[in-house]
Curated annotation (Swiss-Prot):
Coiled coil: none annotated. Its main location: plastid. The keyword Nucleotidyltransferase applies. Transmembrane segments: none annotated. The keyword Cell membrane does not apply. It comes from Phalaenopsis aphrodite subsp. formosana. InterPro entries: DNA-dir_RNA_pol_bsu_ext_1_sf (IPR042107), DNA-dir_RNA_pol_su2 (IPR015712), DNA-dir_RNAP_su2_dom (IPR007120), DNA-dir_RNAP_su2_hyb_sf (IPR037033), RNA_pol_bsu_bac (IPR010243), RNA_pol_bsu_CS (IPR007121), RNA_pol_Rpb2_2 (IPR007642), RNA_pol_Rpb2_2_sf (IPR037034). Pfam families: RNA_pol_Rpb2_2, RNA_pol_Rpb2_3, RNA_pol_Rpb2_6, RNA_pol_Rpb2_7. This is DNA-directed RNA polymerase subunit beta. Its EC number is 2.7.7.6.
Length: 1070
């Protein structure tokens, strides 16, 4: 029934496999395909010929390591060499050399590329697959109009449609449409060939009139008519060779090149047998498409679902890199042709190495990785973030959709997404449904199809054989779900099972099943697969949890979860943050920086990552997990990375939580925590910030790094060494100088001292002064200096400045304002840190660590946190760890609840604590108020939950403005923390202040602290001398701006003062 080409896969495929396979396909096949498109280059007189021998190209191993590339801000790339030959046809001489084409960035062990010292990743793009698609639309009068859309390999679209008069038109753009007969004739078919190759010749003969028959009488007339309508030119154009070339370039190459994928889809849809290497639209294709369209009009055939994954394909890293390589070769071809012409003009003898430059390829890839929307900076907040980023897909980008034009139908979940695209994990906001994650078992096929594995059941023995199926194949089979997902194949299957067939969900007999799903997590992404009891959560909360797990900060002391799903180990392994033994051997030495391993008589040095900064300022560190003298096996973990524990992903901590109100401090999702989490460093994390300064060569001379900076206090320079750079290990406070720098500048004539003017007048010496441009530590950046890097420029070019980078580590304990979250979308802000003795405590005297709002559970419908909380308590008491797959109700009803209650009952018996499981209110317990020692009135749900500390921390968000910059036009303070901006007092805030009657505060907000220029200056002077702050008398700048705006509209705004005594009007201008 099914061909099995994927036997033997017993584990989940590597999570970074898609990136690796894509890059290998680019190196092995993509380069060769683009090289074969490189044509011979000749001069105008055809005397010199240049060509490349593309069969023997060579990629050299990178000259630097990944660590050096990151450290020195270089690109981790490989040099590409190709043999080239230059032939002089007149003298029959030939010169062959190996030329350097350029550098190609190489993928590293994380599945990413290092460009200019930055980890970058290319995400997958889902685009409409080239081919032909049929659809119908209702007009305003209720008549159906059938159209077919031909999508080229470059994204160009051409439409065929039948109007109400049964006339067939080809629409090459939104405005122009042309008769199908004219288009067919312009493509080379005459009227007799058209009528002989269609199924409905009477329809073709019915609509052309005498004028149209004249247009299609010859190919030249058809081309002229088509060109006149397509290019929208007036008059009567004359047929010429240049006109044909222009039409070929503008229309046929852009809109009629199908590519290999488009040719395959067109043959399959129209039942054609045209060879695969014929990648352009032929007249035969056009006539077959019209026949099919007429059949649709007559009620035959099926319409296409544009949202189905069989009509889409993935542009992976292989396709994107191959497109850029082809673009670079086109630029190289133009450069070589221009160089040959220049050499002949100047009567020089060129060589292949002189003709070829590496600029085209190098700059093309640097531009792609730096500017392309699908090339993104790798998010390295934690290991999960790294690995999920490489499995993202997007409808956005060049050739795709935009967030504002994408319809709801495109964003919605489609039945063909089953097992291929995660229905949970997607972006929030304007890009919802346009970006998401691939399911964990997905494989990208050769043609860009998203393939998912199934167990194919043979007709005789019903034995399972694993097969990968594309979306256009599995809809023809009955795919079982539900109870058939049991991992134990020996379980007797029921007679009737739920199944999926042709995008419909049915209930059929087991004997009719063709395929069955292979794993309970098959249809989820990595983020969603790490949520225990996800089947008990609302999908919106599961989406939030998938996104928030990627925002978790690695803690100083990692702890793996008590309740998990079983994928934590592979996630940590595939992320690459842990060090894995590549061979067996004996550990002979370990420290914090390296491990020495003796294997087969050789000693291997394995370096470890120490306090490396991620682009989210989190700390990536590796800790040794093996001891000296121990023997290890291949694949054993030598050192654990950040946010890992025991080889498993460990993003948070197991803490004792209670769901109860407490004095309003957990109102609206606020969280009350114990001070134990602070002084025991349970949620302490390290953050590393980078500060950089560059030295340039100015017109007045080079900038200098020095400690000798005049007119500065000595305390600001106390941490600098003799070179003017901060010393390692120094404790730095806000405002301290990290790097001392002086920039030379020429002073004005009036600022010279008398002796300087004398030297200048007598000796002509130009006296220069220096401006202090040192690197200072900004507000909120206090910490310990852990690394200083002085990166010198390579070569003598002044465009490459020297850079000095200072890395400062901060130790952040959890505090009020930090954001915490569980794995079920239950998030909140720390509202108060309570002393340990005031926290509610259990019947055995254990104080609670966190108090959550119980009202956050029923309305959000994320009941999975209740199961995790209770099972976590049982696991903590029994010293167990649970790994539970989703949808355990496939075994029996209420399986989750039975498991939790049985474990709580066992924990109650084993620990002899009856309060752990009380039949009257299972899962709940009577706890005491820490302040009074009294019992709370109602039993409270308590347990151990796995809570994460997120990257949204109050230290990065808190901000206060004392003075700062003002906008030039409105003279109001700027907005934003980065600009030392202020907080806007809007209309509703003014109402609030008016409601309290605080007139003086309101006046300050609208004048001194806003845009009253004169009042600001007077307030500053009064504060310095200690005088009374004067009241503002004139209008603020915003009012003056309004007056100027009205004047620009020829409207004059004045006000008049009327005296009560003599009723005279004194006019004063605003």
């Amino acid at each position: 029934m099914l061909q099995n080409g994927n036997e033997g896969m017993s584990t989940i495929p590597g999570f970074s496999q898609i990136q690796f396979e894509g890059f290998c396909r680019f190196i092995n096949q993509g380069l060769t395909e683009e090289f074969h498109k490189f044509q011979k280059i000749e001069d105008r007189d055809q005397e010199i010929e240049f060509q490349l021998f593309v069969e023997t190209y060579q990629l050299v191993e990178p000259l630097i390591t990944e660590r050096d590339a990151v450290y020195e801000s270089l690109t981790y790339s490989s040099e590409l060499y190709v043999p080239a030959v230059l032939i002089w046809k007149t003298g029959r001489n030939m010169q062959e050399q190996t030329v350097f084409i350029g550098n190609i960035p190489i993928m590293n062990s994380f599945g990413t590329s290092i460009v200019n010292g930055i980890y970058r990743i290319v995400i997958n793009q889902i685009v409409q697959s080239p081919g032909i698609y049929y659809r119908s639309e209702l007009e305003h009068n209720g008549v159906s109009v059938y159209t077919s859309t031909i999508i080229s390999d470059w994204g160009g679209r051409s439409e065929l449609e039948i109007d109400r008069k049964a006339r067939i038109w080809a629409r090459v753009s939104r405005k122009q449409k042309i008769s199908i007969l004219v288009l067919s004739s312009a493509m080379g078919s005459n009227i007799r060939e058209i009528l002989d190759n269609v199924c409905y010749p009477e329809i073709f003969l019915s609509f052309p009139n005498d004028k149209e028959k004249k247009k299609i009488g010859s190919k030249e007339n058809a081309i002229l008519e088509f060109y006149q309508q397509f290019a929208c030119v007036g008059g009567d154009p004359v047929f010429s060779e240049s006109l044909c070339k222009e039409l070929q370039k503008k229309f046929f190459q852009q809109r009629c090149e199908l590519g290999k994928i488009g040719r395959q889809n067109l043959n399959r849809r129209l039942n054609l047998d045209i060879p695969q290497n014929n990648t352009f639209l032929l007249p035969r294709d056009l006539l077959a498409a019209v026949d099919h369209l007429i059949g649709m009009k007559l009620g035959m055939g099926t319409l296409d679902d544009m949202s189905h994954l069989k009509n889409k394909r993935i542009r992976s890293v292989a396709d994107l890199l191959q497109d850029q390589f082809g673009l670079a070769l086109v630029r190289l071809e133009n450069t070589v042709r221009g160089t040959i012409c220049g050499a002949i003009r100047h009567k020089l003898i060129p060589t292949p190495q002189n003709l070829v430059t590496s600029t085209s390829l190098t700059t093309t890839y640097e531009s792609f990785f730096g500017l392309h929307p699908l090339s993104q900076v790798l998010d390295r907040t934690n290991p999960l973030t790294q690995i999920v980023h490489g499995r993202k897909w997007s409808y956005l980008g060049p050739g795709g959709l935009t967030g504002r034009t994408a319809s709801f139908r495109i964003r919605d979940i489609h039945p063909s997404h089953y097992g291929r695209i995660c229905p949970i994990d997607t972006s929030e906001g304007i890009n919802v449904g346009l970006m998401g994650s691939l399911a964990i078992h997905v494989k990208v096929g050769y043609w860009g199809s998203i393939e998912s594995p199934f167990y194919g059941l043979s007709e005789r023995s019903k034995e399972a054989q694993m097969v990968y199926l594309s979306p256009n194949r599995d809809e023809y089979y009955m795919v079982a779900a539900g109870n058939s997902l049991a991992l134990n194949r020996d379980i007797q299957e029921q007679q009737v099972v739920p199944a999926r067939y042709r995008q419909e969900f049915l209930t059929i007999a087991w004997e009719e099943i063709h395929l069955r799903s292979i794993f309970p997590f098959q249809y989820f992404s990595i983020g969603a697969s790490l949520i225990p009891f996800i089947e008990h959560n609302d999908a919106n909360r599961a989406l939030m949890s998938s996104n928030m797990q990627r925002q978790a900060v690695p803690l100083s002391r990692s702890e793996k979860c008590i309740v998990g799903t079983g994928l934590e180990g592979q996630t940590a392994l595939d992320s690459g943050v842990s060090v894995i033994a590549e061979c067996k051997g004996k550990i002979i030495y370990t420290d914090t920086q390296k491990i020495f391993l003796s294997s087969n008589g050789d000693t291997l040095s394995i370096p470890l990552v120490m306090y490396q900064r991620s682009n989210k300022n989190t700390c990536m560190n590796q800790k040794t997990q093996v001891q000296r003298g121990k023997y290890i096996k291949k694949g054993q973990i030598l050192a654990g990375g950040a946010a890992t524990a025991g080889g498993e992903l460990a993003l948070g901590k197991n803490v004792l939580v209670a769901y109860m109100p407490w004095e309003g401090y957990n109102f609206e999702d606020a969280v009350l925590i114990s001070e134990r989490l602070v002084y025991k460093d349970i949620y302490t994390s390290f953050h590393i910030r980078k500060y950089e300064i560059q030295t340039h060569v100015t017109s007045q001379g080079p900038e200098r790094i020095t400690k000798e900076i005049p007119h500065l206090e000595a305390r600001l320079l106390r941490n600098l060494d003799r070179n003017g750079i901060v010393m390692l290990g120094s404790w730095i406070e806000t405002g301290d100088i990290l790097v001392g720098k002086l920039t030379p500048q020429t002073a004005s004539e009036s600022s010279y001292a008398p002796e300087d003017r004398l030297l200048r007048a007598i000796l002509g010496i130009q006296v220069s002064t220096s401006k202090e441009t040192s690197l200072r530590l900004p507000i909120g950046g206090r910490g310990r200096v852990i690394d200083v890097r002085w990166i010198h420029r390579r070569g003598v070019s002044n465009s490459n400045p020297e850079r000095i980078r200072v890395y400062i580590s901060q130790k952040r304990e959890i505090k009020v304002g930090d954001k915490v979250a569980g794995r079920h979308g239950n998030k909140g802000i720390i509202s108060k840190i309570l002393s340990r003795q005031d926290m509610p405590y259990l019947q055995d005297g254990t104080p609670v660590d966190m108090v959550f709002n119980p009202l956050g559970v029923p309305s959000r419908m994320n009941v999975g946190q209740i199961f995790e909380c209770s099972l976590g308590l049982a696991g903590d008491l029994l010293k167990k760890h649970y790994r539970i797959g989703p949808f355990d109700e496939r075994y029996e009803q209420e399986a989750s609840r039975k498991l939790v209650f049985s474990e709580l009952y066992e924990a109650s018996k084993k620990t002899k604590n009856p309060w752990v499981f009380e039949p009257e209110y299972p899962g709940k317990s009577r706890i005491f108020d820490g302040r009074t020692g009294d019992l709370f009135e109602q039993p409270v749900l308590i347990g151990k939950s796995y809570i994460l500390k997120l990257i949204h921390q109050v230290d990065d968000k808190i901000h206060g403005r004392s003075s700062g910059h003002y906008a030039l036009v409105t003279q109001q303070p700027l907005r934003g923390r980065a600009k030392q901006g202020g907080q806007r007092v809007g209309e509703m805030e003014v109402w609030a202040l008016e409601g309290f009657g605080v007139a003086h505060i309101l006046q300050e907000m609208l004048t001194y602290k806003s845009d009253h220029i004169r009042a600001r200056q007077e307030v500053l002077g009064a504060m310095i001398i200690g005088a009374t702050v004067p009241n503002p008398e004139s209008a603020p700048e915003s009012f003056r701006l309004l007056v100027r705006e009205l004047r620009s509209l020829s409207l004059e705004l004045n006000h008049f003062l009327v005296s009560e005594k003599n009723f005279q009007m004194d006019r004063k201008e605003a």
